Amino acid sequence: GASCRCDSDGPTSRGDTLTGTLWLIGRCPSGWHNCRGSGPFIGYCCKQ
């Protein structure tokens, strides 16, 4: 899937590392967690 920015990745700027995986269907899979707290966002940003 596509990469997405977790809250722990820091503020948005050039050269950010995107450690999350965008999950569009339902919630994060078992063993993963949503790593993005808030904001206008489609789907979930999941991380193992």
UniProtKB/Swiss-Prot annotation:
One of its GO terms (biological process) is regulation of signal transduction. Its main location: secreted. One of its GO terms (cellular component) is nematocyst. One of its GO terms (molecular function) is toxin activity. InterPro entries: Anenome_toxin, Myo_ane_neurotoxin_sf. Keywords: Cardiotoxin, Disulfide bond, Ion channel impairing toxin, Nematocyst, Neurotoxin, Secreted, Toxin, Voltage-gated sodium channel impairing toxin. It is found in: Secreted; Nematocyst. Disulfide bonds join 4-45, 6-35, 28-46. It comes from the Eukaryota. Binds voltage-dependently at site 3 of sodium channels (Nav) and inhibits the inactivation of the activated channels, thereby blocking neuronal transmission. Has effect on SCN4A/SCN1B, and SCN5A/SCN1B, has no effect on SCN2A/SCN1B, and SCN10A/SCN1B. Possesses the highest efficacy for the insect sodium channel para/tipE. Also interacts with sodium channels in cardiac cells. Shows lethality to crabs. Belongs to the sea anemone sodium channel inhibitory toxin family. Type I subfamily. This is Delta-actitoxin-Bgr2b.
